[in-house]
Amino acid sequence: MGLFSSDTVTKSPKPVNNDQDNNQIFSVPKETVDEVLPITDSELLRLKSLVDSSSVPQELKDRISVRLGQLNRLVNSPSYLDEYDRIARYIDWVTKVPWNKTTEDILDLKRARQILDSHHYGLEDIKNRVLEYMSVMKLKAEKGEKNEVLKAPTLFFVGLVGTGKTTIAPSIAEALGRKFARIPFGGMGDPLDLRGQSRLHLESEPGKIVKALISVQSMNPVILLDEIDRVTEEGRSSIMGVLVELLDPKQKFCLC
């Protein structure tokens, strides 16, 4: 479930292009080598063992194995250390992602109502929207459709300062029994903060969304995108473009 708040905005997750290599921490270019080359270097074997013992999806494991096999041929090359640093940093991040970890939803409407009421007075529209979502989830569970993908709603909180936009978010997470993560937008000026940097950079890092998943060690947390109206003027348009990608129901299925 995604949440975001703003003090001044009124009501109103593009696909990654592998050819241009503006890929995030999950992205690995498709290899032209079909055969996985043998790995003999001890450091590369350690990295491969780290990947094999992790919960990284098999397709990604296979691609990383290909990269490691190619890198093994460069052990005596001057470019080896730089390439090793890149792949080691990449593997360090992808193995931290909680690929198969989710929290079990607590679909007790009475309990959820009590939690929401105990933290905030009023805000009935928000509370009813959350309870409506939980009701649909509970109904699907009773019909044996619990494992069916249910797109999480995006709630847009608009209001004056001090009306509970930020504080209601952790209450919603508690009511659902999910982990909670907050991403502050105040002063943000670079869309790469959200999208992540290309793995080809030595200091590359994933975006704040992926970092939030790593921090809470869950793939289905409630994420609050806080104070989106306070991004810098210079980066506003590009950051809002990334938000469209993240919040578009047709593109954010991986964050549900």
Enumerate the predicted regions with their spans.
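AAA+/P-loop NTPase substrate/partner-engagement loops
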Residues: A175-E205, A212, T232
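Conserved alpha-helical scaffold flanking the Walker A/P-loop in AAA+ ATPase domains
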Residues: L200-L224, C256
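Conserved catalytic/switch belt of AAA+ P-loop NTPases
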Residues: L225-C256
